């Protein structure tokens, strides 16, 4: 019987465990975490048994590290000192890859232990073992730093989209689309809070646009500190690049260059619309935003058009904003459903759909 050791039974680790158990009920899932977390995971059937780190690592055929980056680095150093099985495969679930892969390659060079970096690009506003979700990774990108049929087979129950990406390129890409946006969100919150000291209405008038831009500022502070310190060069380079773009639009405003400013927004809109927005560290939904009039029955009218679809979530934005009258957000699990729903709504109504 193949034994899988999962170290870290939070949202990611426990959700991975559920996916493995679904696809491979014959495998034994060992779990290592704090005792109270292990007990919950075992009681809920997420793991088959709890195990002490050394014993579990020595018995395991595959080890999955689902812990913060700094902890992953320390665990790799510990595990490398254990008497491990020949052919052991180790992977992780960290948000950066270069530092982890480089250390693992140093530690296991010349051994029969194989390390392949992993990054399931999925998450939730919930956390911990109680938030374990079998469907968390469905249709989400799952990055591997090397091709591995063994990992693909192990994790097939997650129904994720596996892509192979060099560790350094991974950190460059995620540095732009994942790490840097968290800096922007928190910076905007800090800036607004500071500005509100002289202009108190800032906090009252911050509406949908501000909320959407800053939502990720509520993310785990310890985790994101670890992420940034594991990818500092790319992070700093992206900050400098962003300063350059801000300076460019500032110059356009200074010159009162309306044509250039309009081009700035128009091109930004086109680029955004052309992007295939997938899940990053957020729920794996494909969101449709519908601007609707403030009329009785309008929401039911839209939902009636979509009665044959599998809808993951519905959110009604009741705020009155100068740029959007009212907004209905409908989330789908599949991109195909989103596109079909968009076409149906655009054909049956005159509502703006984005």
Swiss-Prot record:
InterPro entries: 6-PGluconate_DH-like_C_sf, ACT_dom, NAD(P)-bd_dom_sf, PDH_C, PDH_N, Preph/Arog_dehydrog, Prephen_DH. It comes from the Bacteria. Pfam families: PDH_C, PDH_N. The keyword Oxidoreductase applies. Residues 287-354 form the ACT domain. GO terms for molecular function: NAD+ binding; prephenate dehydrogenase (NAD+) activity; prephenate dehydrogenase (NADP+) activity. Signal peptide: none annotated. It is an enzyme of class 1 (oxidoreductase). This is Prephenate dehydrogenase. The lineage of its organism: Bacteria, Bacillati, Bacillota, Bacilli, Lactobacillales.
């Amino acid at each position: 019987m193949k034994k899988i050791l999962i170290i870290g039974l939070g949202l990611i680790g426990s959700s991975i465990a559920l996916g493995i158990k679904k696809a491979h009920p014959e495998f034994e899932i060992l779990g290592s975490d704090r005792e109270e977390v292990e007990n919950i995971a075992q009681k809920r059937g997420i793991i088959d048994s709890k195990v002490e780190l050394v014993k579990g690592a020595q018995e395991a055929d595959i080890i999955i590290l689902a812990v913060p980056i700094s902890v992953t680095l320390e665990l790799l150093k510990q595990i490398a000192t254990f008497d491990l099985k020949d052919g052991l495969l180790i992977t992780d679930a960290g948000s950066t890859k270069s530092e982890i892969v480089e250390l693992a390659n140093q530690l296991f060079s010349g051994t029969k232990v194989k390390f392949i970096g992993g990054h399931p690009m999925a998450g939730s506003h919930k956390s911990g073992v109680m938030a374990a979700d079998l469907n968390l990774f469905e249709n989400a990108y799952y990055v591997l730093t090397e091709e591995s049929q063994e990992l693909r087979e192990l994790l097939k129950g997650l129904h994720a989209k596996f892509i192979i990406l060099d560790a350094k390129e991974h950190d460059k890409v995620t540095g732009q689309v994942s790490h840097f946006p968290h800096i922007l969100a928190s910076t905007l919150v800090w800036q607004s809070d500071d500005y509100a000291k002289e202009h108190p209405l800032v906090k009252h008038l911050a509406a949908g646009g501000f909320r959407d831009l800053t939502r990720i500022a509520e993310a785990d502070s310890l985790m994101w500190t670890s992420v940034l310190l594991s990818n500092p060069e790319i992070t700093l380079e992206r900050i400098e690049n962003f300063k350059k773009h801000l300076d460019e639009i500032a110059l356009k405003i200074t010159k009162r260059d309306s044509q250039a400013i309009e081009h700035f927004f128009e091109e930004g809109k086109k680029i955004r619309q052309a992007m295939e927005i997938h899940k990053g560290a957020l729920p794996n939904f494909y969101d449709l935003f519908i601007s609707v009039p403030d009329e009785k029955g309008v929401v039911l009218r839209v939902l009636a058009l979509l009665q044959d679809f599998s809808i993951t979530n519905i959110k009604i934005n009741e705020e009155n904003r100068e740029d959007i009258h009212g907004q209905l957000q409908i989330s789908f699990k599949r991109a195909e459903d989103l596109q079909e729903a968009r076409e149906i709504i655009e054909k049956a109504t005159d509502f703006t759909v984005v």
